[in-house]
Amino acid sequence: MLSMGISMLNSRLAEIRQQADPPFTGASAGYGDFFVAKTKSAFGIDASSKIGGIELAMKTILEEAERARRFGFTETEYDRARANYLQRVESAYNEREKMKNDTYVNEYISNFLDNEPMPGIEYEYAMMNKLAPNIPVTAINQVMQQLITDNNQVVLLAGPEKEGLKYPTKEEITALLKQMKSFDLKPYEDKVSNEPLLKEEPKGGKIISEKAGDIYGTTKLVLSNGVKVYIKPTDYKADQILMKGTSLGGSSQFADKEILNISQINGVALVGGIGNFNKVCLLYTSPSPRDMRRSR
């Protein structure tokens, strides 16, 4: 339940990061060892900011922590986080015969140093699929109320020594912490749409040729739209399909004077959204375009 609440809080922080002018350059929440103290665990939330934006970044992460404590999380947020968690557990279960050595090593280390149980993925898979569907979001919200407290707080502020750069004083930080319970906040509104990414399924093409053993044991397919597909089965993973598409051309097709503008195309494509879905809606399905080059 603890990890689920932390996951949903981090999703909210990630959404804020997608704003045109976000209050921080990065932010995250977590629960674990208090700095290097193995005997003390603590909730923590941190942010990095641009110069001159320290107070705003600090206030924003405190607002989000207080919003989670005061109002909790929504059913749709929880459904999404739980589905993602169970998918990860299922993936680990399906790949149990393909686990790398470091997975076992890390489990042994956690067991020895932190007394972390290591029942095995078979037990975890069965137990999580039995428990997770029966844990309501109200239980997660109660955990967050206990986790985020207004006492026994520690603030660490670090930054460069620079002439003219002013940092908040101890008194200003203390005053901000005391304001948390009186922040003017509204419950979080989950704006993720349930409509399909494509309103109409595109008409399928045909395979016009197939050639086995083309390159490195691949099978080459040529489609009716001219696309060439190379398929290569491997036994690296038991339940994973990887796909990548390229269209040669890219920035090499533009004049040299446009290089600065063209270098930003990939970033613009990622933040522009797709159809009726903005960047926030697509946080959980993120394509990664990049340019390829060819000679003129």
Labelled PLM ranges:
Residues 5, 53-60, 64, 74-81, ...:
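Stable alpha-helical elements in mature extracytoplasmic
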Residues 6-48, 107:
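A structural supersecondary motif
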Residues 42-51, 65-72, 126-131, 247-255, ...:
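Second-shell loop/turn segments in exported
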Residues 284-295:
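Single conserved hydrophobic/aromatic residue that forms the stacking wall/gate
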